[in-house]
Amino acid sequence: MMGREHDKQAQFTPDHLGTKPVAYKRNKGKKMHNKSNEQPDVIQTKGE
């Protein structure tokens, strides 16, 4: 769970990524969610 939250925060703060594009990270997260076959917790966290 904590790992997912970290991913979300990293997306919000592209400062940490710097050389890495945010789109790349987003794509990775999307793939992960698809593999897990579970609802994206990121969206729920964002709403809250």
From Swiss-Prot:
One of its GO terms (biological process) is sporulation resulting in formation of a cellular spore. Residues 23-34 have a biased composition (Basic residues). Coiled coil: none annotated. Keywords: Sporulation. It is found in: Spore core. Pfam families: SspN. Residues 1-48 are annotated as: Disordered. InterPro entries: SASP_SspN. Induction: Expressed only in the forespore compartment of sporulating cells. The keyword Cell cycle does not apply. The keyword Ligase does not apply. It comes from the Bacteria. Its main location: other. One of its GO terms (cellular component) is endospore-forming forespore. Belongs to the SspN family. HAMAP family: SspN (MF_01505). This is Small, acid-soluble spore protein N. It comes from Bacillus pumilus (strain SAFR-032). The gene is sspN.
